[in-house]
Amino acid sequence: MVNQHFENIISNKKNIFLRSWPSNNDPTYNIIIIHGLGEHSGRYKEFANFFMKKNIGVFSFDLIGHGKSDGLKGHISNIKDFTDSIEDVLIEVRRRYINTPIILFGHSLGGCLALNYLIERKSKEISLAIISSAWIETEIQIPKYLLIIQRVMHTLFPKVRLSNRLDTKDLSKDIKIVDKYKNDPLVHDRISLNLLSEINKTIKKIKNKDYNIEIPVLIIHGKKDKIISYKGSELIHKKIKNSKLKLYDNVYHEPHNDNERKEILEYYYDFIKNHKK
C-alpha cells in the first residue's frame, strides 16, 4: 500500500480536504481526481495505488459539502465554488511540480465538473482529461412532482436536501465495493434543491454551448450503468473533436471499481502513454 498524505487547502474561505499519493521519484504525470456526488476522495485508493506503481502521482480532494471538506452535506451555493476548488487544487499541484504534466480525471458529477472546468477556465495547465460516467443524462427516473418542486422551491429554500435516490447495488458488480460504500461514514445520500439546480444549469451549458476543448480527452462509460446514461457520453464525444469514446458492454456506474477495473485502469494508462509529451 502506497503512503497517503493528508492536508487542508483554502478555497473561497472554506477548508478543502486534499489527499495525495506522491511519487518517491519525479512523476511523469500527476492526476487530479474529481469524485462523484455523495462520495469522497478516499474511495480512490486502488486507483491511486495502480498509478503510483506507474510513477504517476495522484491528488484527490473532497468537494465542498462532501467528505471532510467544509460545507453542508450535498449543498452548494454556486457551481463556481466547485470550479474554484478545482482551480485551487490545480494551483497547489502546479506549485509543487512546476514542470510535471497534469491529468484531470472526473467521475459522474466529477465528470460534469471536469468538463465545465475545461470549458470555463480553458486552463493551459491540463495536458489530458479522462471523463468517467459523466453526469449528462441520468438513467434514474425522477418523478415529475419532484422536478416541479425543485424548480419552484430552490430559490426560496435552497438548502432543503432530498435523497439522491441512488440504489447502491448499481455502482458495481463487486459486492465488496457496494458494501464498503454503504458502510462508509464519509458517504452521504443528500442533494440540495440548489445543488440540483446548479448541476442542471451546468449540464444544459455542456450540451448546448459551443466550445473548443483542445486537449486529448478520453470518455469512458459502461452500457450497464443504471445511474447515468452512456448516451450523454456519446453526446459529449461528438462535441469534443479531440476525444476518444470507450464503452464497456457489461460495466456498471463506477468503471474503476467494477470487476473489469484492472483492464480499465490499464486502458487509462495506455491512453496516457500514447499522449506522452
Language-model features: locations:
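N-terminal cap/lid segment of alpha/beta-hydrolase-fold proteins
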Residues: M1-N25
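Short beta-strand/loop motif that positions the catalytic acidic residue
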Residues: I213, I219-H221, D225
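Conserved alpha/beta-hydrolase
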Residues: R43, A48-L72
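Conserved hydrolase catalytic core segment
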Residues: P101, L109-I131, E137
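Catalytic nucleophile-loop/oxyanion-hole region of alpha/beta-hydrolase
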Residues: G38-S41, G67-Y97, I264
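Short alpha-helix in the alpha/beta-hydrolase fold that links the catalytic acid
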Residues: I215, S229-K238
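Catalytic active-site module of serine/aspartate enzymes centered on a nucleophile-bearing elbow/loop
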Residues: K244-K277
